[in-house]
């Protein structure tokens, strides 16, 4: 029995020694370079102000990062109408046209052709 315990203990010591030398044990986490937080902590706030972040890609900004320009005609400008507003404006103009047509305000205009349907012809 004592001989089996000695062999077991020797085997465990051999396995522990081999796993430590071959790197089979618990892997340690490697540190791979500087992060912005560690650089700011170690170098101070003046290093962060001059740091060019990853969002400063010239010409490769995302939709959320587009700056709103005040100038007209530039991409991202407030004055440029969105396609949704064009659709809404067209629908509003069409509805106002139908309202004027029902009210009879368009009958007196000479430039607009009369659009009569088959139902209108049957009623008259």
UniProtKB/Swiss-Prot annotation:
Residues 1-19 form the signal peptide. Keywords: Amidation, Cleavage on pair of basic residues, Hormone, Neuropeptide, Phosphoprotein, Secreted, Signal. PANTHER family: GALANIN, GALANIN PEPTIDES. Residues 20-30 form a propeptide. It comes from Rattus norvegicus (Rat). GO terms for molecular function: G protein-coupled receptor binding; galanin receptor activity; galanin receptor binding; neuropeptide hormone activity; type 1 galanin receptor binding; type 2 galanin receptor binding; type 3 galanin receptor binding. Pfam families: Galanin, GMAP. It comes from the Eukaryota. The lineage of its organism: Eukaryota, Metazoa, Chordata, Craniata, Vertebrata. This is Galanin peptides. Belongs to the galanin family. The modification Threonine amide is found at residue 61. It is found in: Secreted. One of its GO terms (cellular component) is neuronal cell body. The keyword Phosphoprotein applies. One of its GO terms (biological process) is positive regulation of cortisol secretion.
